[in-house]
Amino acid sequence: MAVAVTAVLFLAVVIAPQWTETKKPPRPSDTSDTSGTSGRDRRTMCPLSIPGIVQNCYATLNAFPSKECCKDLKTASKREVTCLCNNVIAHPDPLYTNTNQVNKACGVLDKYACDAGNSNGGATKKIVASMGLFGVVASLFF
């Protein structure tokens, strides 16, 4: 009986925060393509609007970016930052694995955080993880 109660409490503790967590609406792709094509086509067109940044900064596989790269990253518009976040940084290609190192070296890590609108800084996931761990530990003792 105690095992069943512990199992139910464990599931309630782990699952409940996921039910009460607010969900963000899906973000539309921010692209330069206004021809009315499908979202998938527009997402693939977005990197074409910023080839210089991708080529000079992320495609080099070098953690030490050039001055030109840093200048481009620092002067990028909000539209370009959103495009890079949605297509290169958030969904990295194996060729672009150095995005965080390049952004950090150029001093623009905060600008390219890609989820700056989330003000809790991942606290929800930490709470869920700690509650799940508590449930596992509690189930060992009861």
Curated annotation (Swiss-Prot):
Name of the molecule in the record: Non-specific lipid transfer protein GPI-anchored 34
Statement: the UniProt record of this protein carries the keyword Signal: yes
Composition-biased stretches (Low complexity): 29-38
Describe its membrane topology. Lipid-anchor; GPI-anchor
A GO CC annotation recorded here is: side of membrane
Sequence segments annotated as region (Disordered):
21-43
UniProtKB keywords: Cell membrane, Disulfide bond, Glycoprotein, GPI-anchor, Lipoprotein, Membrane, Signal
Q: What is the scientific name of the source organism?
A: Arabidopsis thaliana
Kindly indicate whether the keyword Magnesium belongs to this entry. Answer: no
Q: Please report which protein family the annotation says this sequence is part of.
A: Belongs to the plant LTP family.
Function field = Probable lipid transfer protein.
Signal sequence, start to end: 1-22
Please report which positions carry a covalently bound lipid of kind GPI-anchor amidated asparagine.
120
The highest taxon in the source lineage is: Eukaryota
Q: Pro-peptide positions?
A: 121-142
Q: List the disulfide bonds.
A: 46-85, 57-69, 70-106, 83-114
